[in-house]
Amino acid sequence: MVSHRSDPKWEFAVVHNGIITNYKELRALLETKGFRFETETDTEAIAKLAKYIFDEHPNIDFTTLVKAVIKELQGAFGLLLKSIHFPTEVVAARKGSPLVIGVRTQRKMKVDFVDVEFGEDGPLPAEAASQNVALKKSNNLLAPPDKSLLHRSQSRAFFSEDGAPQPIEFFLSSDPSAIVEHTKKVLYLEDDDIAHIHDGQLNIHRLSKDSGASNVRAIQTIEIELQEIMKGRYDHFMQKEIFEQPESIVNAMRGRLNTENKTITLGGLKQYITTIRRCRRIIFIACGTSFHSCMAVRGVFEELTEIPISVELASDFLDRQAPVFRDDTCVFVSQSGETADSLLALRHCLERGALTVGIVNVVGSSISMMTHCGVHINAGPEIGVASTKAYTSQFVCMVMFALSLSEDRASKQARREAIMDGLGKISEQFKEILQQDQDIKNLCLKFKNQKSLLLLGRGAQHATALEGALKIKEISYLHCEAVMSGELKHGVLALVDESLPIVMILTRDSLFAKSLNAYQQVIARKGRPIVICSKGDSEFPGDKTDKIEVPQTIDVLQGLLNVIPLQLMAYWLAVAEGLNVDFPRNLAKSVTVE
C-alpha cells in the first residue's frame, strides 16, 4: 500500500493499494501539462491527475472529480483520496482490489445496510451540466457521461433506532482485521463502488446500474475477537499461528466431520455436489501456499473420485488462456479470497460457463462472493505474511471435499473411513510434533551462515517440500530449493557434498523404498541430511542421523504432519538472523496485484 501527494502543498493525497497499468501514459500526459514527478510510483500519477482536473475545473465537486480520475485509470486498485479543497470529505473507490469500511456508532443503527445511489437519468441542473461540458472540453481526458451526476442524501442506516441522528466514525482498510480493534461492523465495497464520506455520512455511488446488481451494501458483523489478532505469550504472529494449528484444523472439521457415523457434511457445497460428481474434470487454481495445498491433495482426489484432476498456478493459467468448458469444475483456493491472479482466472472460468468453487478463509471476500459455491476453512485471522495455519486448514477442507465427492462410491468406503479416522486423530498428533519446537531450533544452528538449502520429497511429499522451501525463502531469505526425490539423479546430485545442507522427507508410505534410494545416494556423496521420518523408524539410528520424528498417519494425511517441522524450521532460521518474521521484505499478506 502506497500513499502520495499531488504537490508540495498536499492539495490532494492518495492512499493506493494495487497497480495502475497505464501510469506511464498518464505520467507522460501530465508532464506535458507542466507537472514534475518526485518518484517513479504509479500512485503519484493518480494524485497529480486529480490536481490537474481540479485546476481545470475548480468548481467541480469531489465525487465527480474522483469519477473523472477513475475513468482514466487502468488496472486494479483500492483508492482513498483526501484534499485540502474538500476538508471534511474523503472519497474511496475500488476496482479489483479489496476495500472495507468499518462503522462505529454509539447506539444501534436503524437499518443494517447502506443504499447504493446510481446515476440519474433525468436532465441535469444547469450547474452540473456546465460542469460536465467543461470536463468534456479538457484535453485528452474523458469526462463521465451526462447521466453521471452524483446526488447526496442522508443515509438512513446511520440514524439510531429512534430515528435521531447520532455520532459516527468510519474506518477504511483493505483488510477487516485492521479494523476489528475499533469496530466489528463492516461494509464491503464492490468493484466500481465509490464511497463518499462527508458530514458524518456515508454515501455509496455507482455511475451505472448493472443488471442484477444489488441496490444495497450490507453492514455485517465480523466474527473476529481482538485476542485473535494479538500475539499473546508468543514473540511473533507466525509462531502463534503455527501453535494454533491443533485448534484451527478442529475448527475446519467442526460440524462437518462425524467420525462415529463416518459422514461428511459440507453445507456450502450441498446444492452442487451431484453436479460436481458428473463433471469432466476438476481444475484447482491457486497461487503460492494455496497452490501447494492443492498439489498436496491432488492424489487423494484422483484416488477417491476417479475424475481427472489438474492443478494450475493462476498466473500461468491466465498467460496461456487455458481452455475451460461448461462441464468443468474450477476450484479456487485462497486464504484472503482477494488474490488478484486467482480473481482474474475466476472471471475467465465464469465467462466460459464452468462451475466454480471457492475455498477461502475470509468471509465476504471477492472469491467467496463470485463463485457458485464453496467452503470456508475457518482458520481464523492469519496476520503473519507467511501462511501456516491456512495451509493445513485448506488441506483438511479439500480432503473433506474429496471424501464428500466419493460418498456414492461403494468400492471406496473402506478407504474413506480410514481417512476419516486419520482426520479425527490429527489434532493430537500436531500437538506431539509441536513439543519438539526446541529440538528443531537447535537443529537449525547447523544452517548458520549457509547460503543455500535443499529439500527432498517424493509423491505427495513433494508438495510438502515445496511449501517448506517457500516458507524458508519467505521469512529467512535463505535460498531453498524443493526437489522431487526421483529427479535427484537427473542433475541435482551434482550439488551434493559434505557442506550442502539437505532436509529429506522420509516418512513411511508406499514410496518409502524409492525415497530411501535417494537418501542412500546422498549419503554416498558424503551428504549428511536432516531427515523427517516416522516415529521410531529404525532405518535412521539417532547416533548417526540428525532427524525429526513425526507420528505415522494414513498416507494421504502424512503431509499435514510433515509440514509442521518445516514451518518451525523456517521460523527459527529467521529468528536466528534477527529478521522481521511476520512482515518479510517486499511481500504482502494479500497479493491484490498481478
Model regions: which residues?
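Conserved short alpha-helical segments that host acidic/polar catalytic motifs at enzyme active sites
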Residues: M1-K231, D235-M238, E244-R280, K431-L434, ...
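Short, glycine-/Ser/Thr-/acidic-enriched flexible segments
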Residues: P8, I19-T21, I84-T88, K95-L99, ...
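Glycine-rich, anion-gripping cofactor-binding loops and their flanking helix/strand elements
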Residues: V103, R107-D112, E120-P123, Q131-L135, ...
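Generic C-terminus detector
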Residues: I204-K209, I219, E223-Q227, M238, ...
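Extended hydrophobic-aromatic, low-complexity segments
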Residues: R206, S293-M295, S310-V311, A340-L343, ...
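Active-site phosphate/pyrophosphate-binding segments
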Residues: Q245-I283, R326, R352, V363, ...
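Glycine-rich phosphate-binding loops that contact phosphosugars or nucleotide phosphates
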Residues: L269, R277-K425, R458, I505-D546, ...
